[in-house]
Amino acid sequence: MNSIEFPLLDQKTKNSVISTTLNDLSNWSRLSSLWPLLYGTSCCFIEFASLIGSRFDFDRYGLVPRSSPRQADLILTAGTVTMKMAPSLVRLYEQMPEPKYVIAMGACTITGGMFSTDSYSTVRGVDKLIPVDVYLPGCPPKPEAVIDAITKLRKKISREIDEDPISYQRENRSFTTNHKFDVGRSTHTGNSNQGLFYQPSSISEMTSDTFLKYKKVQYPATNEKVN
């Protein structure tokens, strides 16, 4: 078709055709439809819940909250994470398909917050358990700050390369020292003798002398009645 005879047609064609790469198209589709898994445990999550309302309306960013980690590509942690909750959080993260992203929301999630000063069971930073892409400080952060964190994550996704996106994410994430979990069987004996903590997991593997040694617990005699 002769473009000289149809100048208007040629002008419309240039304005309606977009040339791009498959990598950019893939990044655009992922950043425009993030499906978050909401892992909220404290007051920070209340601030995130306000985004669902009509004032902020996070649906315009393509965010669709999911209840299953297998359908989510973004996990948003908000609130205090304890040592007892840590294995569940790691399990949820491992069940998410690649590529996946993490936003740490609030001081308690990032550093442990005020609960980490005198608590032995508080995880001092969720990045000790799972890699974090965006840190969102605040106590609690405002809904506008959450939108800003999502915008920064979208910009990060748009710059990802197509060669190996999974390794690219892992190389560009911040890690700190991981917690070491020693799984043991607790015994409520009434005193500080916890010798069964690191014994074999099955009682059948113990010798009879070892079992009877910790089985016999001497309680002080008392005549007081407890109401």
UniProtKB/Swiss-Prot annotation:
One GO term describing the cellular component: respiratory chain complex I
EC number: 7.1.1.-
Catalytic activity: a plastoquinone + NADH + (n+1) H(+)(in) = a plastoquinol + NAD(+) + n H(+)(out); a plastoquinone + NADPH + (n+1) H(+)(in) = a plastoquinol + NADP(+) + n H(+)(out)
Subcellular location(s) per record: Plastid, Chloroplast thylakoid membrane
InterPro entries: NADH_UbQ_OxRdtase-like_20kDa, NADH_UQ_OxRdtase_20Kd_su
Chief subcellular location: plastid
Keywords: 4Fe-4S, Chloroplast, Iron, Iron-sulfur, Membrane, Metal-binding, NAD, NADP, Plastid, Plastoquinone, Quinone, Thylakoid, Translocase, Transport
Residues annotated as binding [4Fe-4S] cluster: 43-44, 108, 139
Top EC class of this enzyme: translocase
Cofactor field: [4Fe-4S] cluster
Membrane topology qualifier: Peripheral membrane protein
Keyword Cell wall biogenesis/degradation: no
Gene Ontology biological process terms in this record: aerobic respiration; electron transport coupled proton transport; photosynthesis, light reaction
UniProt keyword rRNA-binding, yes or no: no
Recorded GO MF terms: 4 iron, 4 sulfur cluster binding; iron ion binding; NADH dehydrogenase (ubiquinone) activity; quinone binding
Listed Pfam families: Oxidored_q6 (PF01058)
Family: Belongs to the complex I 20 kDa subunit family.
Role noted for this protein: NDH shuttles electrons from NAD(P)H:plastoquinone, via FMN and iron-sulfur (Fe-S) centers, to quinones in the photosynthetic chain and possibly in a chloroplast respiratory chain. It has NADH- and deamino-NADH-specific dehydrogenase activity, using ferricyanide or quinones as acceptors. The immediate electron acceptor for the enzyme in this species is believed to be plastoquinone. Couples the redox reaction to proton translocation, and thus conserves the redox energy in a proton gradient.
Listed name of the protein: NAD(P)H-quinone oxidoreductase subunit K, chloroplastic
UniProt organism field: Pisum sativum (Garden pea)
Top-level taxonomy: Eukaryota, Viridiplantae, Streptophyta, Embryophyta, Tracheophyta
